[in-house]
Regions:
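Histidine-dependent nucleotide/RNA phosphoesterase domain, centered on the 2H-phosphoesterase fold
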Residues: 2-209
C-alpha cells in the first residue's frame, strides 16, 4: 500500500502485479483521524525509541488473514467470492485501545468494539479463501494493529513503548471496507511497501480501490 489505508475516503491505487508471486493478506483499516489519535499517543515512544522499525502510519491495518506468498494467478479467483462476502457483511464499529507486544519484539495496539463480529468476519474470510483452493498458514486470530518491531538486542524499547500505551483509549470508528493487499516483504532491504489489489465496501459489494 503506497497510499493510506482508509475505509471511507482512501485513495488507494490498484497497481498491476509485475512479479510471478506476491505476498497477500486481507485486512481492515482505521480512518485517518483514529490513526492520528494513536500517533499522538505514540509521540513519547517515537522520541525515545527512534531506532525501532516503525510502520508507516498510512499503512496501519488489522490483518484478518495472512495468505503468504501466492502465484499472481491465484489472486483473480479470490475476487468473486470476496465480493459476495463483503456484500453480505455489515460494517463494524471498532476502536484502538491500549498496547502490548509479542515476544518483546513486535509492538501493537489492541482492538475493542464489535469483537464477536470481527472474529466472525475473519473466520469467514479465511473459509472463503480456503474454498478457492488457497492454502495458507493457520494462525489464531488475535485482533491487533502492528506498530513497530524492535532492532536486534533492543527488546526493552518494545516493552517500554507498550507500557506507554497502557492507558490509551481511542474513539470509536466504523470499519466499512475489506482490503485485499499485496506487499513486498522479503523482496529486498528497503522498507515494506503495500499496495491495494482490490477493496470492497462492507454491505454494499465492490467498488474500485
Amino acid at each position: 500500500m503506497n497510499e493510506s489505508l482508509e475505509p471511507v475516503s482512501g485513495s488507494f491505487v490498484t497497481e498491476p502485479v509485475r512479479a510471478a508471486t506476491t505476498r497477500v493478506f486481507l485486512a481492515l483499516a482505521p480512518p485517518d483521524d483514529a490513526k492520528d489519535e494513536l500517533a499522538r499517543a505514540l509521540g513519547p515512544a517515537y522520541a525515545a525509541h527512534p531506532r525501532m522499525r516503525w510502520n508507516r502510519i498510512e499503512d496501519w491495518h488489522i490483518t484478518l488473514a495472512f495468505l503468504g506468498e501466492l502465484p499472481v494467478t491465484a489472486v483473480p479467483p479470490l475476487r468473486p467470492p470476496l465480493t459476495g462476502l463483503a456484500a453480505r457483511r455489515a460494517p463494524l464499529r471498532l476502536a484502538l485501545q491500549g498496547g502490548g507486544h509479542f515476544d518483546e519484539r513486535v509492538l501493537w495496539s489492541g482492538i475493542t468494539g464489535d469483537l464477536e463480529e470481527l472474529h466472525s468476519l475473519a473466520a469467514e474470510v479465511r473459509a472463503v479463501v480456503r474454498e478457492c483452493g488457497v492454502h495458507f498458514p493457520e494462525r489464531v486470530f488475535r485482533p491487533h494493529l502492528t506498530l513497530a518491531r524492535s532492532r536486534r538486542g533492543d527488546q526493552a524499547a518494545t516493552v517500554e513503548a507498550a507500557a506507554g500505551l497502557a492507558g490509551f483509549a481511542g474513539r470509536a470508528w466504523v470499519a466499512g471496507r475489506l482490503y485485499l493487499v499485496g506487499s513486498n516483504v522479503g523482496r529486498g532491504p528497503g522498507p515494506i511497501r503495500y499496495r491495494t489489489i482490490e477493496a470492497w465496501d462492507l454491505g454494499r459489494g465492490t467498488e474500485p480501490a
